[in-house]
């Protein structure tokens, strides 16, 4: 949920008992006021909301060969951590940036440059007690992220597994991701698609095998943060209730959101 959306509709979000994943874009990081963040965090805490944060990602590359690009990326990630600290989140989701085509398959180069970015970010995240969850995006198989996890060897530094991105880009079975990275899963992003667009559909409305995914979670005894990612407000109920069926939870009803809140849901 974009920060500006939360800022404008805090009363609705808190009254409906939502646990938001707050997205701080680069623009939001440049424009937010600490006093607003403190107020929002207090209201969410008063409503016992559980919060996660999603950091900026557009144009950023923690494994960039260009040191100036890495510096901009590190600066943005640092800003996101400081903004996140107001909310005492369960985790902050950031992107690792590996793309086989961009790096010409050179995972070693990407990893070496990535570690230059992540070491100070990881240190600050530990000081703030905010676990970092790296989200899979364009990775075709889990080894780049596995190399990163092994190199850092920090339980505070894990994975946000995105079901939709897996389905779009992975060239290997879901089981291979769980066998390789499952023990590092901090969070799941749950949405569906038909493998031709990042549609962010409610689970069960595309072609992803969520029976297999939840069976693997049980087999590996993984208990992550579950985050639904509908991009349309009319999909919120169906997204939540589809996950409820797998988790044995009660159904969820948003009733009617006010005009304007449906513009964008992360």
Where are each of the predicted segments found?
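Alpha-helix-loop-beta-strand connector modules within alpha/beta enzyme cores
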Residues: 40-58, 113-127, 210-213
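Active-site acidic/histidine proton-transfer and metal-coordination neighborhood
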Residues: 63-158
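Charged helix-capping and loop-helix junction motifs
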Residues: 34-39, 69-77, 107-118, 171-180, ...
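Acidic-and-aromatic substrate-binding clefts and catalytic sites of carbohydrate-active enzymes
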Residues: 1-8, 24-36, 61-63, 101-102, ...
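N-terminal pre-domain/capping segments
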Residues: 1-81, 85, 146, 249, ...
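A structural motif
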Residues: 17-18, 84, 89, 185, ...
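Histidine-acidic metal/acid-base catalytic patches
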Residues: 7-14, 142-157, 167-266
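Hydrophobic faces of well-ordered beta-strands that scaffold small-molecule active sites
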Residues: 1, 20-22, 51-54, 92-94, ...
